[in-house]
Amino acid sequence: MITGELKNKIDSLWDIFAAGGLVNPLDVIEQITYLMFIHDLDDSDNLRAKEAAMLGLPYQSIFADEIQVGERTIDGQQLKWSVFHDFPAGKMYSAMQEWVFPFIKTLHTDKNSAYSKYMDDAIFKLPTPLLLSKVVDSLDEIYRLMNESQAVDVRGDTYEYLLSKISQSGRNGQFRTPRHIIRMMVELMDPKADDVICDPACGTSGFLVSAGEYLKEHRKEEIFFDRQKKDHYMNHMFFGYDMDRTMLRIGA
């Protein structure tokens, strides 16, 4: 469970979007998801660089010295959250629109992947530099509280609380299945390493993510020490469908 202080910060983040003119709950959660992904991309790259350094192994950062974004070559460091979050509002907004967002849309090299397919028409919708600056500051506070938390899965709980905003609105019949119900259903199904798992109304892919986590916990050696089964897990096991393309982008 997340703390009252963290819930208040998340509620304040939604208020910031509303005050900035972005009130559609699906648009809000979509934009928050993009920004959290950009933040986590920086964190995971830093972690992998440290692990490689500890093991004395070479590491090629995704934020290379020079990165091609469209027809421009830019300094990859300026795509990192830890760098651009200190920019003035106007410069940060320009960097997000012109460099960072186009960069994340083309991250996956396989153009046939779900990520590439559904990110192809993704749009950065924050309308003003001031709104982006306030949202980035608010997310920094949320991440600070998550890092200070002693909860086992505080990030999952935080995103779960964010998604609850969609179910509260009840837009187009989109309602969230509670996570403990999802876990129970996955445990009852007890997926195997060679299964194909499909959710015909996947929404934000909660069932698929939970099934993936279950397999990593209960079939880890069977999957990750067998090249064929690992490829199946990474590329051919999970399928999600939804009538709402925004939900598919969030899920992907």
Label every model-predicted segment:
Residues 172-252:
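Conserved S-adenosyl-L-methionine
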